[in-house]
């Protein structure tokens, strides 16, 4: 997973200053599977990399397609970020899964956060 979202927020709050978002090398862009432009999202349900224009076209087709969760691709390292799109333009950031264990005398509680979509 990419740390791009947090770094992007820091960059935007820094008057739009230009800095590297990821420490990994810049890879070749992934192409949109419909038009060949640079892909910006990956739809797991369709198993397709799509540019923003094609993503809007494909996922506005019907109510089932609007439910698809699409992962945003980092512009620097080309990996999938935690930032997702649902529906037309609804942004969601997936939380990191962390396990917190609290051990008491005779029991332990395990808490794992999750997201309903």
Swiss-Prot record:
Residues given in the record as Zn(2+) binding sites: 32, 35, 54, 59
Motif PFVFL, residue range(s) on this chain: 113-117
Function: Developmental regulator acting by forming heterodimeric complexes, that sequester CO and CO-like (COL) proteins into non-functional complexes. Engages CO and the transcriptional repressor TPL in a tripartite complex. Involved in the CO-mediated long-day flowering-promotion pathway.
InterPro entries (alphabetical): CONSTANS-like_Bbox1 (IPR049808), Znf_B-box (IPR000315)
GO function terms (MF aspect): protein-macromolecule adaptor activity; zinc ion binding
Domain characteristics, as noted in the entry: The PFVFL motif is required for interaction with TPL.
Phenotype upon changing residue 68 to A: In miP1a*; loss of interaction with CO, but no effect on interaction with TPL
Induction details: Circadian-regulation. Peak of expression toward the end of the dark period in both long day and short day photoperiods.
UniProt-listed GO biological process terms: circadian rhythm; regulation of flower development
Xref: CDD domains: Bbox1_BBX-like (cd19821)
Keyword annotations: Metal-binding, Nucleus, Zinc, Zinc-finger
Effect of substituting residue 35 to A: In miP1a*; loss of interaction with CO, but no effect on interaction with TPL
Record note on what altering residue 51 to A does: In miP1a*; loss of interaction with CO, but no effect on interaction with TPL
Subunit composition and interactions: Interacts with CO (via B-box) and with TPL (via PFVFL motif).
Subcellular location: Nucleus
Species: Arabidopsis thaliana
CC terms in the record's Gene Ontology section: nucleus
Pfam families: zf-B_box
Tissue: Highly expressed in shoot apical meristems and in vascular tissues of leaves. Also detected in petioles.
Protein name (Swiss-Prot/TrEMBL): B-box domain protein 30
Zn finger (B box-type) start-end: 27-73
